[in-house]
């Protein structure tokens, strides 16, 4: 039985007790089903004992908890839940795909893209195609696989601005910490790919450490030979509560909004826009 640290309060006990009462189980009944002892369950609930990952998995199974609520139990005990791969294109998520199509369509003419936690592109809107077609060929657009790589590889500057350097630094910092916390090789691969981009500042770690990440940041792009500022806004699509950052499918919608209110992006819209990830 692992002992809980006296100076590290845990919310695991109250949460476990909540689920036990929800299922109308006594400590004895829960212990029997979880191959444990009544004393151990009691110690878990009053904070005298700290659960192992294996114990949490067993309790989640016995209590018939879904991924969202299992994540809550793990977070309450101080563990980062392991991500489970979920195929966004699985037929059982057709309802979610339809909702995302409506969302992306409503954002036209502003360029918007749906991606997974690694930045892999899942869907784009017509605004995205028309906008990026100003700087990239149709072939390059069709072959784009990762939001971050595409965004920075096809919008290079002769002399990268401080805004771009800071943006790259923040994205790298996010990927690096995700990689270290989750030990997910996909994040590590994504980090290495971004680090290899030509405009990455050599002091990206210190830059990112001095900046506070936000849901929106500025990016600068050359549109018709004129430097324009855009707000890059990312919105999370996931479960309510803290598990939105760990439960799957963890989706992100990124949209670019021009800082200049007079910049009309509808001029890039046309009926002939096409892309493998355009679903309407």
Question: Which residue stretches match the model-derived regions?
Answer:
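A short, Lys/Arg-rich alpha-helix, primarily the initiator
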Residues: 1-23
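Alpha-helical residues within the helix-turn-helix
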Residues: 21, 32, 61
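Short alpha-helical DNA-recognition segment
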Residues: 24-42
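Short, basic-rich loop-to-helix N-cap that marks the start of a DNA-contacting helix
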Residues: 47-60
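Short amphipathic recognition helices of helix-turn-helix/homeodomain-type DNA-binding modules
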Residues: 55, 62-93
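Hydrophobic protein-protein interaction segments
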Residues: 101-106, 126-261, 266-280
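Conserved hydrophobic beta-strand signature of PAS-family and PAS-like sensory domains
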Residues: 121-122
């Amino acid at each position: 039985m692992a002992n809980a640290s006296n100076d590290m309060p845990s919310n695991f006990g109250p949460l476990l007790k909540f689920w036990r009462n929800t299922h109308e189980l006594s400590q004895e009944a829960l212990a029997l089903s979880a191959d444990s002892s009544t004393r151990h369950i009691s110690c878990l609930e009053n904070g005298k004992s700290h659960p192992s990952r294996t114990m949490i998995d067993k309790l989640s199974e016995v209590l018939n908890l879904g991924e969202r609520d299992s994540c809550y139990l793990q977070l309450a005990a101080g563990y980062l839940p392991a991500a489970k791969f979920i195929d966004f294109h699985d037929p059982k998520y057709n309802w979610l795909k339809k909702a995302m199509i409506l969302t992306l369509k409503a954002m036209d003419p502003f360029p918007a893209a749906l991606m997974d936690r690694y930045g892999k592109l899942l869907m784009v809107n017509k605004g995205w195609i028309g906008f990026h077609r100003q700087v990239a060929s149709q072939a390059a657009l069709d072959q784009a696989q990762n939001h971050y790589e595409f965004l920075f590889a096809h919008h290079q500057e002769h002399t990268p601005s401080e805004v771009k350097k800071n943006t790259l630094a923040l994205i790298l910092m996010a990927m690096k910490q995700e990689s270290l916390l989750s030990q997910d090789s996909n994040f590590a691969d994504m980090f290495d790919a971004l680090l290899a981009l030509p405009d990455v500042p050599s002091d990206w770690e210190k830059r990112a450490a001095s900046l506070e990440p936000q849901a929106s940041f500025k990016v600068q792009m050359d549109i018709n030979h004129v430097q324009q500022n855009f707000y890059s806004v990312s919105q999370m699509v996931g479960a309510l509560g803290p598990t939105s950052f760990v439960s799957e499918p963890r989706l992100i919608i990124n949209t670019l909004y021009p800082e200049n209110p007079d910049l009309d992006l509808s001029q890039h819209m046309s009926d002939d826009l096409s892309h493998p990830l355009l679903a309407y």
